[in-house]
Regions:
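A residue-level signal for conserved active-site and pocket-lining positions in enzyme catalytic cores
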Residues: 38, 64, 114, 213
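Short glycine-rich anion-binding loops that position phosphate/pyrophosphate groups of nucleotides
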Residues: 42-45, 68, 154-156
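ATP/NTP phosphate-donor binding region
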Residues: 1-36, 40, 48, 52, ...
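Proline-centered loop/turn at the N-terminus of a beta-strand
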Residues: 57-61
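A generic structural signal for short beta-strands and their flanking turns/coil linkers
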Residues: 95-99, 110-112, 127-131, 146-148, ...
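Catalytic core of DAGKc-family lipid kinases
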Residues: 68-146
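Gly/Ser/Thr-rich active-site loops/lids in small-molecule metabolic enzymes
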Residues: 143-186
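ATP/nucleoside-binding phosphotransfer catalytic cores, i.e., glycine-rich phosphate-binding loops
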Residues: 108, 116, 122, 135-139, ...
Length: 231
């Protein structure tokens, strides 16, 4: 698949060169630069590229060459449609809100979600955990569940949706708290302003933290964990 993607990228680059512009092919995220970024891949590739591009303030458009293409604008058979889009200097750019996760002073950005999950080990009992949440310092609720998801509007169609969360349109000025396999059927998702800051009271023993599916670390009662909108 890498060879197919490379040949497609070379063909797109040739069209861009023919239009009088410069095109550079990248295979590593650390190499990314330029005014527009075209990503050939699935949602995993889009997530990694978008987070890197956001640091550089580069707009991203994706073509689905992977398994899932929720985040990509075009499917494989629509590849050529990306050319006039990236050449149009007046094309609309949709900005997506991201999470900034801070764990004991270390910061991580998430485009989809932060997941706090109870670790499952073959030699230990599997029990639910209790997580208390404060919004801007005020107690907002206590969740008894296998874990908790903090989702952006972009991530509302991913893990959060599978856990029973609501779908939010990309322009919503909200984030969403969704319990994972909640102990009580009355425990539901909470939508809150993305201008607010979340803080957590975590149980004894470590929870596992994942940002967009990537392991971030572990956190427990002695750790300080906050989530806010990334600037």
């Amino acid at each position: 698949r890498e060879q197919v993607d490379r040949s497609v990228a070379e063909r797109l680059a040739a069209h861009i060169f023919a239009a009088g512009h410069t095109a550079v092919l990248f295979s590593e995220l650390s190499e990314i630069c330029g005014d527009r970024l075209v990503v050939l891949g699935g949602d995993g590739t889009m997530l990694r590229a978008a987070k890197r591009a956001s640091v550089l303030n580069i707009p991203v458009v994706g073509v689905n060459y992977g398994r899932l293409g929720f985040l990509t604008e075009f499917e494989r058979e629509e590849t050529d449609k990306v050319i006039p889009l990236v050449l149009d200097e007046n094309c609309a750019v949709l900005r997506r809100a991201m999470l900034e996760v801070e764990l004991n002073g270390s910061k991580f950005d998430c485009l989809n979600e932060l997941a706090l999950l109870h670790p499952v080990a073959p030699d230990k009992d599997n029990r639910v955990v209790t997580i208390s949440v404060a919004i801007d310092g005020s107690h907002a609720g206590e969740f008894i569940a296998d874990g908790l998801i903090v989702a952006t509007p972009t991530g509302s169609t991913a893990y959060s949706l599978s856990a029973g969360g609501s779908i939010m349109t990309p322009d919503c000025e909200t984030f969403q708290l969704t319990p994972v396999c909640a102990f009580s059927m009355r425990s539901r998702s909470i939508a809150y302003s993305n201008r607010s800051e979340l803080s957590f009271s975590l149980p004894k023993g470590a929870l596992v933290l994942y940002g967009d599916g990537v392991f971030l670390g572990q956190a427990g009662a002695e750790d300080r964990l906050t989530v806010r909108r990334s600037v």
